[in-house]
Amino acid sequence: MIFQSFLLGNLVSLCMKIINSVVVVGLYYGFLTTFSIGPSYLFLLRARVMEEGTEKKVSATTGFITGQLMMFISIYYAPLHLALGRPHTITVLALPYLLFHFFWNNHKHFFDYGSTTRNLMRNLSIQCVFLNNLIFQLFNYFILPSSMLARLVNIYIFRCNNKMLFVTSSFVGWLIGHILFMKWLGLVLVWIRQNHSIRSNKYIRSNKYLVSELRIFMARIFSILLFITCVYYLGRIPSPILTKKLKETSKTEEGVESEEEGDVEIETTSEMKGTKQEQEGSTEEDPSSSLFSEEKEDSNKIDETEEIRVNGKEKTKDEFHFHFTETGYNNIPFYDYEDSYLNMNGNQENWKLKDKKAAKRKELFRFEKTLVTTLFDYNRWNHPFRYIKNDRFEKALRKEMSQYFFQIYESNGKQRISFTYLPSLATFGEMIKRKISLYTLEKSSSNEFDKRWVYTNKQKIKNLNNEFRNRIQALDKEFLFLDILEARTRLCNDDTKNEYFPKMYDPFLKGAYRGRIKTILSPSKTAIDNLRDTIGINRIHSILLPDINIDYQEFEQKANLFDKKQLLTEMGNFLPLAGEFDIEQKSNLNMKGLSLFSDQDQEKIDFEKERKIFKFLLNVIRTYPIDQKIQKESVGIKEIIKKVPRWSYKLITDLEQQSGEHQENVPVDHQIRSRKAKRVVIFTDNKENTDPNKDNDTSDQRNEVALIRYSQQSDFRRRIIKGSMRAQRRKIVIWELFQANVHSPLFLDRIKKSPRFSFDISVLIKLLFRNWTGKGAKFEILEYTDEETKKEDKKEKDKKEENKRKEQARIEIAEAWDTIPFAQVIRGSMLISQSFFRKYIRLPVLIIGKNIVRMILFQFPEWSEDLEGWNREMHIKCTYNGVQLSETEFPKNWLTDGIQIKILFPFCLKPWHRSKRRPSHRDLMKKKKQKDDFCFLTVWGMETELPFGSPRKQSSFFEPAVKELETKIIKFKRAYFLALKVLKRKTKLLLRVSKETKKWIIESFLFLKRLIKELSKLNPIILFRFREVYESNETKNEKDSIISNQIIHESFSKINSPNWTNSSLTEKKKKDMSHRTSTIRNQIERIIKEKKKITPTPRIYISPNKRNWNTKRLELPKNIWQILKKRNARLFSKFNSFIKIFVERIYIDIFLFIINITRLNTQLFIESIKKIMDKSINKANKERINKKNQNTIYFISTIKKSIDTINNKTNSYIFCDLSYLSQAYVFYKLSQTKVSNLYKLRSFFHYLGTSFFLKTEIKHSFEKQGIIQNELSLKKLPSYGMDQWKGWLKGHYQYDLPSIRWSKLISEKWRNRVNQHHMAQNQNFKLNSYEKGHYKKQKDSEVYSLLNQKENFQKNSRYDLLSYKYINYQKMRDPSIYESPFQVQVNKNQDFYYNSNTYKHNLFDMLESIPINPYLVKGNIRYMEKNTDRKYFDWKIIKFFLRKRVDIESWVKINTKSNQNTKIGTNNYQIIDKIDKKGPFYLLLPQNPKINSPSPKKLFLDWMGMNEEILNRPISSLEFWFFPEFVLLYNLYKMKPWVIPSKVLLFNLNLNENVISNNKNVDGKQKTECVIPSNKQIKNKNQNQKEKETPADQEDLRSDAQKQGNLGSVPPTKTKQEKDNEEDYAVSKIKAGKKKKQYKSKTEAELDFFLKRYLVFQLRWGDALNQRMINNVKIYCLLLRLINPRKITISSIQRREMSLDIMLIQKNLSLTELIKRGVLVIEPDRLSVKNDGQFIMYQILGISVVHKNKHQTNQGYREQTYVDKNRFDLLVPENILSTRCRRELRILICFTSKNRNSVDKNSVFCTKNNSSQLLDKRKDLDKDKKELIKLKFFLWPNYRLEDLACMNRYWFDTNNGSRFSMLRIYMYPRLKSH
């Protein structure tokens, strides 16, 4: 039907059929199994690689295929499966075979007879090759498990109908795969042999001998490979002998001492009726599947069973649980039980005799079974299970217990196979069958049973139907509706006092209670005697007691008389066996119980009554053993419970073991791997005991103070049980030493990795452009100080980074030492030896050597000084962390845990000691710097500052000597330079003499010049031309240029990238270079200037102060050039950052282009497909569309469309996206199919005139719904708007999910949409009216406080409404007028906003006016009932409690322009349902002034953190792949609704400071108030303060997002409504909780406050503080051990090792202060949300249930509706009966479904007021209508929709604790068409 909407529908369906066919799937699975390569392939490869002849190849291939064929057949053929599937046999056979195989490979000649060509089959080696391949195929399945692919076959076979065909096709697929594989292998080998390049390789040619050797040893290589793979595979399954045995806990029962578990365990096999439960990857089996298949295999105990609470409620079954608990009989095996209760001798002596026999048998039996239990312990954790502690006293639950157990049972009088049979019942049945002769079973034939069964069923149905009819007929007679409902019976405790059971536990009212009540009653002795006197007998007794021959028929007719005593003994024997009675039977047999009968000795007991009594006895009564000392005999009754299997171990962690927290009965050794930690004892306090009475052993009480040192390494073994299968945690790679989370290799690309070959482009650019800055340019230093500070910051940052890196390296080294086995032993011994070597060998030798040399050099020896320094050096033993102990004391377990050796005052040998003069200031400063006068010893004898740090530079012995030498050289230099100065002075005198001579020569030259001048007057020839030159200016310019060039260099050195390493040497070189270049540049400039000098014109006045015009003209371009140069320099300085930005921009553009291409392509593709589909659908639907009422409907699966198209008014219906819908769509369509029920009134309805009887409104509504057809629209079918769907689902409370659930379900961002299309003209009026309505509604909804009481009724009524509307849709009037009866009765003043006009549906249409009820989410969140303080989510600005509910219009957006008062704009408004007097939350909604603006301003609160620009289109989950930037935002700012924020958890911190101070002052003895007082009181105290300023606490506890500034500013003042909310919040908390505990002190209360919630919290000190504290601890540890600690204390305080300020412990730190200081960090715990069956159901329906609440005050009108008591329209008739009768009726109808004509039997459900006549007379209904009703009955067979969900989803539902989830499938009635 759905495929018809596609153009290629038929083709697709054909393809689907082919793909899903058994043969294709089989071939596919078979082909897949080819790739599951295991050890069995090795033999196949071996035969191919080793050229041993074709015979071996053939035999290998044949064996391989035969083995695989056997495996495939074993899936189908049960005996073979059992033979191969028994793990112990396979293991026992496999291990010797492997040994034999390795032996055979190593001694090959032992078997080979030489090749006998006559008969190859006689050659043993060929046979062995065949066997190897065959057997290893079989091993591969069990002892050596291959990957999952091989097991897919087994999984699929359960789903497949034609199993043999599937097995065959999968084998064929496997064969094809293997043939291809072998061919490929052959080709590769041939290519290797023939490839010339490989053969001519020089390495291979040079090592020809090696190659031939390799061929010879190929067999050995293969056997080694095989051995390695076998070991590896066995590593995945812990070998039963090698794995860690867990010590069991001894079980203690009240009054009964039971034996140890080890004595009781027995291994049983898992075969039963050809079925087997397989445990993947484990050789041990699951006790859940253990049965008694053979007579030899007996069991003393199936498994220890206890009650288990699931989410605080018991999972129970209405079945008999025959679990054999250990009682006084527990020494007797089963067959003794049987003998005992069959022989029916109540003699005590017989019992004693049997005890002795049993003891003997037990001795033998223990010897027999020890082998099996030592090898295989089926209770061992072989999977990497983490141990979950559920209670202090109960053991962990066995989770892998299978619920599938196949057994034959009788149903409807015929034998059928049940796959959820009770194992215990089957075991019991087997046992009885074995022991009891068959005559009792053959007594009454099966037919008789069937007849009787069918007859009683018919009678019951008849009676119920009659009652039902009578009640409906009473309705016709207009009796009051409430009088007709069947009265519910209640369970009564005491008739006289009229005490009833609590409603919660009453099985009649609420169904079987799944909780647990433990009540101990003390009945009178008469009651016990009465029970002894009278107890009924029934058929079970006749089966169990072969002595009493009772004819069943006689038993039916007349009551049987019986002997009380005999029955009592017999009951005593039987009941312990049934596992429901614990009776202490040591001296005599006493039956304890409740009086169930009258005091008569003999009584006729009706069969029915007796059966009920016996059932009651089995299920309800459980007597407790009686203590002999107590006089009063008390009898305990336990409610119905479900026994669940538990592990027989109680395990503890390493930490618990060391701290000694575990209980007495728990094993001493830990079994759970905890985080790698070592307990370091830092101080032991030995107190001698003065009490002489005590033993000598305990005279010394050792109080150890210990620290626990955790390894920083990533440790993913944590909480795994020892001996569990670690290797099964597949696909986990740990590639770093410190890794926070385990990553799968699949997501390696998602992890941020720093690129290995990363280089800075800016550095290259600088290198390239540095020399382009030109010569002679001037530069200025801009913001020199900034540069300097940046430089300093960078240095600091680098220093920090370096420290961090060193710290990381230290930790890594420490962890490496910790992880390598025996490393600590080696390291410890090396350290000790190094310490000894240093102290007693190396240093003394050096001292002696030095002093001898001094004596040789005629110096005084310094023995005393050196020895003093040597004595001062102390070697202190420290723990691995560096906590000091003492010189002599070694840390506990130092060899395994590690040791450090700290050297205090390390001795440093000096060539000479200075005389002790007064120290100068400089020396003191030096000393201050060297305050850390200690070091740690390394393994190589070096010194290091910190443990595992890098070794520090040791001061050299010759350093002082070298320094002395240097000073002497300097002195020599000084003397030398003095001599030079003198020399210089002498040379200067000489120069002066030469100058004088020079002067004389010049003067003579000038005289000559003057002479020439005189001569020139006669002949005026210009000899020289002068030009005025300003030398001063020039020199200034030179200086400037020099400076500027230096500056250029400096500025560039600043720009250098951080990757540049600047050492002082390179700096020096750079400076030299810059200096040289500047000088050269100046010289060049001078030369150029010289060249440019022009001869001056004759009329030039040479003046030193004036410039002429020429020079100005020349200098102008020079200035311009300089300005340009400056600009260039700035440009170049910014160039690298510009280049960077440019490159990034290019990258971004490229990526965006790529992304957009893919996006656009997919978008175009999707849209084109959509258009095609739309066209075809529109053609098909043209007739159906009512043009007057065109609504746009967008379903959730609608692919991304722009807002324009969404708001487009002319859009037609779009159903195309429903092509993927599930049954929900089918329901929807069916619910719309209308068939007129008003068959008789058709003509009446079609009357066109004004009707006298029919109101026009009713007629119009009928026309609207398509019940009757208007003449004008006869040709057109009614429109398929959302109204009908909404109407149908409206009554069903379950399908209106909280918005959060929707957000989880749907990937689109519909919640951010704003309902933009509806805008009011008069905004203020709109707002005011809304506010009034809002408060009115709040007052009206007070009634909802009754919600908890009426919850059940409301649920039923809504369910009924849905079912009624669904089945009898054609009779319904306008859906939005009607509500469920309860709802309308209660809320008489409720407003109904019914929209008279058709309106546009915006993107989503959620259900209208259905409140989100609290019971929607109650069951889904853990701890909900226990901790009422827990919030669902609280998002700092929006307070949202679970106890109150709210429905938010889309998801509200809030603008930055926030007002004080809560104003609601049209763009963003909320609808608050009718819930509570005060608003459930306050929400700061600002007014949005620009209503019509298409682009809203930037919003500060988007619920998914998206901006409007991104949100122009709704994002479908598909498109996340094309929009990585969206994914980023989505993940970055995802609202975390399921996280409890710290603000809510610590809401008592909202108290102001003075309240806290008041609390502090309260004396401990006085009666203090509760920690969480009502905010009312606080508010009264500090109201003014609150209004003035925001409380500091509130600011502190803002969310991270707020702190980052994402959420903008929160207005400081609160509105009245908000305050009310706060007040109400605190009050409701106190009311909701039960009696609050009164705390002694604030600290206790705060501690309790923490422990109540399962918080993850930690103390965070600052790094510096942390380090200081650790240092203090280390020194305290040392001081504690010293006899006279004064000296060390003073020195450590001087050296600032010990901080005195930390020593003052602040005792009065309250929780609030700790949080304020940021010391205590609270990580909110995540609530685990349990998605049960309901959630899956929502998912089914959620596809097409789309809606958005409208609040249209302008268009709507209000209507008040009342409900008549006798109104019958909305009632599902079935509800007349009580729940029990209803259930019974349903089940009985199902049992007899095949004989039933569904319409006749159930026509009651389609009745109107004339229902009784309709039943009798109206047989001629329309055929269409019949078919439709039948179909509807099938789809809605008066069960909940959950059943359909089960049909759809839960075929294999293993873990929800319900065995009936699948049986529901069979409960649907069969339908026969007439």
Curated annotation (Swiss-Prot):
<dbReference type="GO" id="GO:0009706">
    <property type="term" value="C:chloroplast inner membrane"/>
</dbReference>
<feature type="region of interest" description="Disordered">
    <location>
        <begin position="1567"/>
        <end position="1624"/>
    </location>
</feature>
<keyword id="KW-0653">Protein transport</keyword>
<feature type="compositionally biased region" description="Acidic residues">
    <location>
        <begin position="255"/>
        <end position="268"/>
    </location>
</feature>
<feature type="transmembrane region" description="Helical">
    <location>
        <begin position="172"/>
        <end position="192"/>
    </location>
</feature>
<feature type="compositionally biased region" description="Basic and acidic residues">
    <location>
        <begin position="1584"/>
        <end position="1601"/>
    </location>
</feature>
<keyword id="KW-0934">Plastid</keyword>
<feature type="transmembrane region" description="Helical">
    <location>
        <begin position="221"/>
        <end position="241"/>
    </location>
</feature>
<feature type="region of interest" description="Disordered">
    <location>
        <begin position="248"/>
        <end position="310"/>
    </location>
</feature>
<dbReference type="InterPro" id="IPR008896">
    <property type="entry name" value="TIC214"/>
</dbReference>
<feature type="transmembrane region" description="Helical">
    <location>
        <begin position="64"/>
        <end position="84"/>
    </location>
</feature>
<feature type="transmembrane region" description="Helical">
    <location>
        <begin position="18"/>
        <end position="38"/>
    </location>
</feature>
<dbReference type="Pfam" id="PF05758">
    <property type="entry name" value="Ycf1"/>
</dbReference>
<keyword id="KW-1001">Plastid inner membrane</keyword>
<comment type="subunit">
    <text>Part of the Tic complex.</text>
</comment>
<feature type="transmembrane region" description="Helical">
    <location>
        <begin position="124"/>
        <end position="144"/>
    </location>
</feature>
<keyword id="KW-0813">Transport</keyword>
<keyword id="KW-1133">Transmembrane helix</keyword>
<comment type="similarity">
    <text>Belongs to the TIC214 family.</text>
</comment>
<comment type="function">
    <text>Involved in protein precursor import into chloroplasts. May be part of an intermediate translocation complex acting as a protein-conducting channel at the inner envelope.</text>
</comment>
<keyword id="KW-0150">Chloroplast</keyword>
<keyword id="KW-0472">Membrane</keyword>
<protein>
    <recommendedName>
        <fullName>Protein TIC 214</fullName>
    </recommendedName>
</protein>
<keyword id="KW-0812">Transmembrane</keyword>
<dbReference type="GO" id="GO:0015031">
    <property type="term" value="P:protein transport"/>
</dbReference>
<feature type="compositionally biased region" description="Basic and acidic residues">
    <location>
        <begin position="298"/>
        <end position="310"/>
    </location>
</feature>
<feature type="transmembrane region" description="Helical">
    <location>
        <begin position="87"/>
        <end position="107"/>
    </location>
</feature>
